[in-house]
């Protein structure tokens, strides 16, 4: 009787997604080594599965149902192991919707080898299976690297499930929903527009649903077609990104034919070394066989999902295109590879697999889509601010900054982690260049992430440091970042600068309608004005306290502003309290507010602050 050993899970663990990758070994009995291992699921909630054993190693994907599960592993020589595992649904987390975008006249088919199924029902089966592979792969990467069994959530509902070809037709389970979104464009229009317009076509199709915000969508264009005469894939683009409220990834269906359509087909597909016919796309010239094509299609779409989660291009991993070996996360044997000329690999161990980069997983650890019930909650309204002193730029977020990334040439080149996260993180230009090996004339971008998942990107930090310094009659003062995008082409106003010992305002008068017209600072009977006196005046008494910050509503212009005092008192929002995006500025510790700057068109389209 062979002994069964599970390497990546223990008894009575809690998991948070429907399918879980299991790594294990079987101990040989004398000269006999089992060739397969069988998995029986809890109370026959899912058909029994058989997985290959290679040189004593196996990988299996188990199915779990909400609550307690008993999973039985057996070998053909009587080896047996029962695994107890608890599946907790994360019903409060944001979820990813998976969808096909189809033309308004689409025939609802996709490119496939002659004679193969290629209707919308088969497409749904394949895309559903790919989504669960993304989720299980991510959860295993996170667990393996010490971040817990966490992954992004997929939109699911009780409906006929297709994740096993052995289930009776119509068997209902809680399974991934694959949405079908009709575009206003015809199929031929989708195939004819410049590729970058496909992102907007998909976004328009999602926008028509009028979904609650934020939303997360991964979309595949079903009407993608490969043209052998031009060797072009029409109706395909690989893009992912969006705004804080709208996250969108898009991809074409040119490799969908190679995807597994059920759990029983995962290993066969990733073991299928048959050549792709010349009338089908060979994406990136890395899709010559069925298994290589599946890697590129499933993996590249996961790469775009990574962009929607905020991941930039990384030094290695999924975000550098390590997905041509995506198959290795689910198989113990790799077959002939046209891309590399390799004749195969066996056994395929965990060390041979692709993964998310360490920085991606660190980002996921704090991402709202990956939140576990035991995770603390951080206030979402706290912004990351920065200030300059001397040659140093300091980033501030009271929830804790956990990562600063430095990017140039389209890729992360250096970073600094903070474990535990810190409320303030300071760097000089020289330190940034040292961390990223950037030359003295290399432009770079700095990205700062905090535990409440606020992210700011700054280009050209040396210029920010240089321009922040302003010489006044009472010495060097420092300029804050500018709030408002100068969308009205406003003219620069004269700076208001008042020596610290004299900056003791008695009240602030805000002039506004549905946007900020001006701020008037009173010192007894005297006042200074930034902007103009349009709109209506609104007075806020300071009463011997100090101004320590502002809440600003802004976008193309400054919609409104609120004043924060040292004694804890906060003014109402003056202007449009619902306009633009909410930003906050707090005077750093050890500094004092000494003035204002900004620009004025029909109303103020930017504002900033001076500190000393």
UniProtKB/Swiss-Prot annotation:
The active site is at residue 304. Zn(2+) binds at residues 303, 307, 313. Its EC number is 3.4.24.-. Binds 1 zinc ion. It comes from the Eukaryota. InterPro entries: Jacalin-like_lectin_dom, Jacalin-like_lectin_dom_sf, Metalloproteinase_M10B, Unchr_Zn-peptidase-like. Pfam families: Metallopep. Residues 477-612 form the Jacalin-type lectin domain. One of its GO terms (biological process) is proteolysis. Keywords: Hydrolase, Lectin, Metal-binding, Metalloprotease, Protease, Zinc. It is an enzyme of class 3 (hydrolase). GO terms for molecular function: carbohydrate binding; metal ion binding; metallopeptidase activity. GO terms for cellular component: cell division site; cytosol; nucleus. Its cofactor is Zn(2+). Belongs to the peptidase M10B family. This is Putative zinc metalloproteinase C607.06c. It comes from Schizosaccharomyces pombe (strain 972 / ATCC 24843) (Fission yeast).
């Amino acid at each position: 009787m062979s002994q069964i050993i599970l390497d990546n899970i223990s008894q009575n663990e809690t998991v948070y997604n429907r399918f879980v990758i299991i790594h294990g070994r079987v101990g040989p009995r004398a000269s006999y080594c089992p060739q397969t291992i069988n998995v029986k699921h809890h109370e026959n909630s899912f058909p029994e599965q058989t997985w290959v054993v290679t040189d004593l190693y196996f990988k299996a994907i188990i199915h779990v149902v909400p609550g307690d599960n008993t999973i039985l592993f057996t070998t053909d020589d009587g080896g047996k192991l029962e695994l107890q595992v608890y599946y907790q649904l994360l019903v409060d987390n944001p979820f990813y919707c998976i969808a096909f975008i189809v033309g308004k006249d689409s025939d609802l088919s996709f490119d496939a080898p002659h004679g193969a199924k290629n209707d919308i029902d088969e497409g749904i089966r394949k895309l559903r299976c790919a989504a669960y592979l993304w989720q299980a792969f991510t959860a295993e990467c996170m667990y393996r690297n010490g971040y817990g069994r966490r992954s992004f959530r997929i939109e699911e509902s009780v409906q006929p499930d297709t994740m096993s070809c052995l289930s009776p037709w119509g068997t209902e389970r809680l399974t991934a929903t694959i949405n079908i979104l009709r575009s206003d464009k015809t199929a031929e229009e989708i195939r004819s527009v410049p590729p970058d317009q496909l992102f907007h076509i998909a976004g328009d199709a999602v926008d028509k649903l009028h979904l609650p915000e934020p939303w997360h969508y991964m979309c595949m264009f079903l009407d993608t077609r490969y043209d052998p005469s031009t060797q072009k894939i029409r109706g395909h683009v690989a893009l992912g990104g969006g705004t804080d409220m709208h996250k969108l990834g898009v991809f074409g269906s040119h490799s969908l034919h190679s995807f597994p359509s059920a759990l029983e087909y995962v290993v066969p597909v990733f073991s299928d070394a048959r050549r792709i016919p010349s009338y089908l796309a060979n994406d990136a010239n890395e899709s010559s066989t069925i298994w290589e094509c599946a890697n590129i299609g499933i993996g590249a779409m996961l790469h775009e999902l990574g962009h929607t989660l905020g991941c930039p291009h990384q030094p290695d991993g999924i975000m550098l295109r390590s997905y041509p070996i995506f198959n290795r996360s689910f198989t113990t044997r790799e077959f002939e590879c046209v891309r590399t000329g390799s004749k195969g690999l066996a056994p395929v161990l965990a060390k041979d697999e692709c993964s998310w980069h360490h920085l991606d997983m660190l980002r996921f650890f704090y991402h709202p889509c990956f939140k576990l019930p035991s995770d603390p909650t951080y206030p979402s309204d706290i912004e990351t601010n920065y200030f300059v002193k001397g040659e140093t730029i300091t980033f501030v977020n009271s929830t804790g900054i956990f990562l600063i990334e430095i990017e140039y040439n389209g890729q992360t080149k250096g970073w600094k982690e903070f474990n535990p996260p810190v409320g303030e993180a300071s760097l000089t230009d020289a330190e940034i260049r040292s961390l990223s090996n950037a030359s003295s004339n290399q432009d770079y971008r700095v990205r700062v992430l905090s535990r409440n998942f606020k992210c700011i990107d700054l280009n050209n930090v040396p210029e920010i440091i240089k321009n922040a310094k302003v010489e006044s009659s009472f010495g060097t003062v420092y300029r804050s970042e500018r709030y408002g995008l100068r969308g009205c082409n406003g003219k620069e106003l004269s700076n208001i600068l008042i020596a610290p010992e004299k900056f003791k305002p008695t009240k602030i008068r805000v002039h506004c309608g549905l946007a900020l017209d001006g701020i008037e600072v009173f010192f007894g009977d005297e006042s200074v004005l930034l902007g103009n006196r349009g709109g209506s005046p609104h007075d806020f008494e300071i009463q011997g306290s100090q101004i320590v910050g502002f809440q600003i509503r802004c976008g193309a212009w400054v919609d409104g502003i609120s004043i924060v005092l040292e004694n804890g008192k906060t003014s109402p929002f003056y202007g449009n309290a619902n306009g633009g995006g909410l930003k906050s500025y707090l005077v750093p510790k050890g500094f004092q507010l000494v003035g204002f700057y900004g620009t004025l068109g029909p109303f103020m389209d930017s504002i900033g602050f001076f500190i000393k």
